[in-house]
């Protein structure tokens, strides 16, 4: 049983139907209403075959998406990309994007917004071919290749950058993958000028956040509030988890 206020499981959150999508059911796991998040939002969407996100853009926020299962075709900057489980995608501010599921099984997608979206109709623009809008210049590739990095204070774990300013030009979010061996740990540090979410892919992560102990198993998310002192250690089996940071310049008011 989960007793930590910092750990949230998807089935603890009610589902909703997002705008600009078809055949999609979302659960907003990390947000203002669930954990008081002000700098980022994390949800999991379940999408049926042939459905997904219509072509739209978010003028004032960034979006990153990770395919947990299933397969589909994404489109960013007018470039199509076939995605399968384990792939990340990134949509910068103001860039039109879409996603359609191609697998027989429904796809599940982990989605990150920074700043938070919260289904604000003013934060989304549906594509209108009769009145195309200018977009930022596209990069050479929209594929995201992990970059190994060394994190001070992290022992016994391999860390890779998935999305940040250097790899994808992100201005409001950063995503890293941590592959930890048994006995790995991250020494206590204070989280400054950002909020942090851990998404546990495999194994279990234990630790403390804001003087409260937590234990998070595969499929759960841990929210670390801005200013909190936190640390982590691996469970009996070495875990794999994402570290998702949101550092939007102007956090939402509580």
What are these regions (language model features)?
Residues 1-39, 120-173, 187, 254:
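A short, N-terminal "cap"/entry segment at the start of jelly-roll beta-barrel domains
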Residues 60, 104-105, 167, 193, ...:
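Short strand-connecting beta-turns/loops that link adjacent beta-strands
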Residues 95-98, 228-231:
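Short, charged beta-turn/beta-strand-edge "cap" motif at the junction between a beta-strand
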Residues 24-31, 43-58, 159-164, 174-192, ...:
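Conserved short histidine dyad/triad with adjacent acidic residue
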Residues 64, 78-93, 210-227:
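Short acidic-glycine-tyrosine-enriched beta hairpin
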Residues 100-103, 232-235:
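Asparagine-centered strand-capping/turn motif at beta-strand->loop junctions
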Residues 44, 90, 104-121, 223, ...:
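A short hydrophobic beta-strand segment most commonly corresponding to one strand
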Residues 42-48, 57-76, 112-114, 177-181, ...:
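Short, conserved beta-strand element in jelly-roll/cupin
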